[in-house]
């Protein structure tokens, strides 16, 4: 079952904070909501309420992808992922692959070059070739966790998308509607140009009539 955009953001944040701020991990509901709504390193930027985050956590708990953890003497419930690399996880990934999945969940489709540039706090890739090797490995898993997208016109590199959430379906729908939108825009522009030409012709006729009247 694919993750929703809110669930994907929650898992991505838990993966990120586990690596970048281990002293604050697991995360409280408030801390996780703040992480989900960060304006940096997030695409798109979200504005989740704590109720939204809690709903995503409840759904992920049913999928056995997150678990609660209460500290000794603390009433604050904290949350940790069970997405990968835990005793309860079927999925076992090396650190480089976790970094890539984390970035794709948090920032959407990206090129290998973008992933290398943005991964410095998660994993130290030596070069883009190492990123591509990890991406190819993720794409060849069963089931595949990433997919290479067709290269966009005017772009030098192809982007990669994660296959864990609904992002792929949403992107395919978006791409399918673009030709229709482009056609609609072209028709609108044509109508405007015809109307402008008709106006210019009418003005010329008026000018000719005025000139003939003066002869």
From Swiss-Prot:
InterPro entries: DUF480, WH-like_DNA-bd_sf, WH_DNA-bd_sf
Record-linked Pfam families: DUF480
Family: Belongs to the UPF0502 family.
Name of the molecule in the record: UPF0502 protein Shew_1617
């Amino acid at each position: 079952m694919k993750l929703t955009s809110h669930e994907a953001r929650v898992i991505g944040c838990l993966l990120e904070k586990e690596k970048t701020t281990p002293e604050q991990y697991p995360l409280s509901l408030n801390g996780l909501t703040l992480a989900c709504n960060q304006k940096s390193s997030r695409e798109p930027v979200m504005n989740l309420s704590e109720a939204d985050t809690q709903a995503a956590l409840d759904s992920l708990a049913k999928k056995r992808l997150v678990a609660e953890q209460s500290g000794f003497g603390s009433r604050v419930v904290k949350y940790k992922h069970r997405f990968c690399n835990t005793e309860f996880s079927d999925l076992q990934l090396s650190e480089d692959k976790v970094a890539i999945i984390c970035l794709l969940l948090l920032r959407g489709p990206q090129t290998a070059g973008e992933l290398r540039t943005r991964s410095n706090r998660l994993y130290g890739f030596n070069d883009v070739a190492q990123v591509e090797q990890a991406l190819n490995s993720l794409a060849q898993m069963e089931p595949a966790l990433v997919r290479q997208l067709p290269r966009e016109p005017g772009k030098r590199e192809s982007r990669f998308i994660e296959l864990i959430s609904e992002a792929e379906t949403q992107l395919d729908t978006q791409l399918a509607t673009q030709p229709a939108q482009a056609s609609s825009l072209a028709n609108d522009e044509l109508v405007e140009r015809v109307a402008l030409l008709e106006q210019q012709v009418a003005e010329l006729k008026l000018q000719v009539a005025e000139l003939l009247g003066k002869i």
